[in-house]
Amino acid sequence: NLPELLKAALLEQGYDVKDINITVGTNYEATGEAMAAGTVDLGWLPGGTYALFSDDVDVILTATRAGLSNDSEDPKTWNGDANKTLKNGPQVTFYRSLIYATPSAYGKELAAKVNAGEKLTWEDLDKATWAVQKTSSSAGYIYPSMWLMANYDGKKISDLSNVMPIDSGYGTAFSYAA
C-alpha cells in the first residue's frame, strides 16, 4: 500500500518514518484550507491552488512529467487519426491545457471551423455552452481564462454567456457532452 511504499522510499533516503497517514481532500480548496490551518503536513496541489494559499504554505517539491508527441499550438493538428497524440515526449516542466469541442451539433460545427483553419470569433465562443472547473483549477479554469484574455481582447470565462461550473471531476464534465 502507498504508506508502506513511501516509508520504504524515505528509508532509502535515510529517513526512518514510523507513521504515514494519507487522506484525499474533497477538492483543491479543501486541501488548501487544511494546509493553511495546519491540520495536514503536506499536500499535493496544482499551481492555481498554491497561488490562493501561498501566504500560508511553502513549496518543498516539484515534479516534471512526460511530454506529448504533439506540442503544437495549432488546434487542427491535434485532431484526426493521423495526428494521434502519444505520451512519449521528453520530460517537461510545463502543463498544457486543451479546450475540447464535444459531439454536440454546435461542438461539431466549431470543430469543423477549426479543422478548416478558421479562427473562432468571440461570438462563436460566446454562443457555446462551456463546462468549466472551479476557479482554482489550472487546466479547467485558469489557463482557458488566460487564453481567452490573450486572444479575445481581455475577455474571460466570466464574460461568456453560457458557463456551467462542474466541480465533480473531468469525467463528469465529459459525461455532460454525451
Where are each of the predicted segments found?
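Short, polar/charged alpha-helical segment
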Residues: 1-18, 146
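Extracytoplasmic "Venus flytrap"
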Residues: 1-3, 27, 137-139
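A conserved helix-loop-strand patch within extracytoplasmic ligand-binding domains
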Residues: 65-138
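Extracytoplasmic
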Residues: 17, 37, 45-47, 54, ...
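A ligand-binding cleft/hinge motif common to bilobed small-molecule-binding domains
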Residues: 44-56, 67-72, 145-150, 178
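Short helices/loops that flank or line small-molecule/ion binding pockets
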Residues: 23-43, 51-56, 169-178
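Short, well-ordered beta-strand elements
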Residues: 1, 18-24, 127-132
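Pocket-lining segment of extracytoplasmic ligand-binding domains
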Residues: 114, 126-178
